[in-house]
Amino acid sequence: TGSGNTPQLPKICMELGRGIKGLIGHTQPRRLAARTVANRIAEELKTEPGGCIGYKVRFSDHVSDNTMVKLMTDGILLAEIQQDRLLMQYDTIIIDEAHERSLNIDFLLGYLKELLPRRPDLKIIITSATIDPERFSRHFNNAPIIEVSGRTYPVEVRYRPIVEEADDTERDQLQAIFDAVDELSQESPGDILIFMSGEREIRDTADALNKLNLRHTEILPLYARLSNSEQNRVFQSHSGRRIVLATNVAETSLTVPGIKYVID
């Protein structure tokens, strides 16, 4: 994890001659991740999204006749099977974040195993940070396992229970977040990432933090239903401190730059 394999794998496939007889399909569990990864690969190749690097998510299709790598959600690939049972438009398929084991991902893994005997030319790559690789290898008839070393950094963990054992008064989650933000405001500069369970919780917390009028601090929500421009704000350069409130999309599917502190 953290090795940068998500944007690099499709480029390696292209260098090996894949993506010519068919597309290199690359699935992500979330729309935001699919779009962000496509933009990142296009940027590294000094091209625009929609050219040789395209993406397709619900309500947005940026794939052209020149596209070689197609980022998409796993739901899009699953839907395409209805019209293209042999997935003939692809010569390579990368299933990313397989450890999430969603219904879509599990259906795809089962279907692709059944498909491979009929499509011996099709290359399947399953990637993940945390899955049991031997188990997935056995599922695909003892497929080879390639391990990529991740990058780790020293982490200090501070436990701040919402309910103190010696104190009967119970803080709510919002107050616990305020206290944590206040504690981190005494530390050296760096952006804060707060993990939350869903959109409503994020909106309510963002409203509450904005009312505190924290100096030189920008509050940024990050969830699937935000517009593209609002989501892209987390990747833009900025001054001062940022507090990003996100679902677990920021845990595995994409990297938010500048984060030094995490409140979970």
Give residue ranges: language-model regions:
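P-loop NTPase motor module signature
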Residues: 1-264
